[in-house]
Amino acid sequence: MFPEVISVFGLKISLYGILVALGVLVGYFLVLKLAKREGLNTKAVENTFMIAVLFGVIGARIAYILEHPYEFHSLVDFLALWKGGVSFYGGLIGGIIGALIGIKVFNLPLWKSADIAAPAIALAHFFGRLGCTSAGCCYGKPFPYATSNEVGIHFSDKFPFFYVVFPKGAVAPPFTPLYPTQLMEAFGNLLIFFVLLFAYRYKPFSGFVFSLYLMLYGFERFFLEFFRGVTPPIPGIGLTWNQVVSLVLIAGSILLMFLLKNQKSNVVDYEV
C-alpha cells in the first residue's frame, strides 16, 4: 500500500525492504534466545544463521526468476531485490542448504537447530508478508464481491471478509479490488508462530517443531494459492508449482515425524 517511505540522496527506501529486514532481525534474536535455552554455542548459531540467510536470499531470487523469466531483461533487473521478486519456497530451500552447511562446519546438533529455526522462520515470514502488502507483490486474484475500488482495505460480508485496492506504483494492478493474500498469509504465519512456540515447550522429540512447521505452512500455502493471482497453474493438473511443493512438504513432514518418533536413539540429537 505504501511502496516507498523515504528517499536518501536519491536512493528510494521501500517499506518492503524495511519490513523484510525487520523480520530477519527479529528472527535472529529469537534464534539466539532459543539457542541459549538449548545450551548451544551462540557464536556457531550466529554464523550458521548468516549463512542460511545468504543462501536463502540467493535461492529466493533464483526460484522467482525461474517462475517469472519474462520480468527480467537486464542485469539490473536480476539484482534489484529492493523491488521485490523473490520466492519463499526458493528461499526456504536455499536457507535449509545454507543451514546444513553451517551445522556441518560448526558442529551443531541437526534437529535441535531445526527446531529453534522453525518459529523464527514463521515470525520473519509474518513481517515479510507485511512487506509484500506494502509493495503490492504476491497479490491475489480479483475480488468478485467488491463494492469499492478506492485505494485501501475494505471490509466485506464474503470470505475472507475484506479485500484490498492498491495505488498506482505498486506491483499489483492499481485500483483493482483483490483478494488480500499477503495479509491472509501474514496472519496465518503469525498463528503458526504461536502454535510452534507452544509445541516447542512440549515437543516429544527433537525435530518435531520443524516437522510441524513444514506441515502447517504446507497446508496454509496450498490453500492460499487458490486465491493468489501471481503464479499461473500448471497446464493439465490445475495446480501451481507452489501447490505441488506444498503437497511434497506436507507428505515429507509427516514422513519425517514418523521416522524421528520411531528412532530408538532419538534421545541423542544428530550432527551432519
From Swiss-Prot:
GO CC list: plasma membrane
The protein's annotated pathway: Protein modification; lipoprotein biosynthesis (diacylglyceryl transfer)
Membrane topology recorded in Swiss-Prot or TrEMBL: Multi-pass membrane protein
Primary localisation category: membrane
Transmembrane segments: 15-35, 49-69, 86-106, 178-198, 207-227, 239-259
Biological process (GO), any one: lipoprotein biosynthetic process
Keyword line: Cell inner membrane, Cell membrane, Membrane, Transferase, Transmembrane, Transmembrane helix
Entry EC number(s): 2.5.1.145
Major enzyme class: transferase
GO MF annotation list: phosphatidylglycerol-prolipoprotein diacylglyceryl transferase activity
Entry-linked PANTHER family: PHOSPHATIDYLGLYCEROL--PROLIPOPROTEIN DIACYLGLYCERYL TRANSFERASE (PTHR30589:SF0), PROLIPOPROTEIN DIACYLGLYCERYL TRANSFERASE (PTHR30589)
Its job: Catalyzes the transfer of the diacylglyceryl group from phosphatidylglycerol to the sulfhydryl group of the N-terminal cysteine of a prolipoprotein, the first step in the formation of mature lipoproteins.
Protein name per its UniProtKB record: Phosphatidylglycerol--prolipoprotein diacylglyceryl transferase
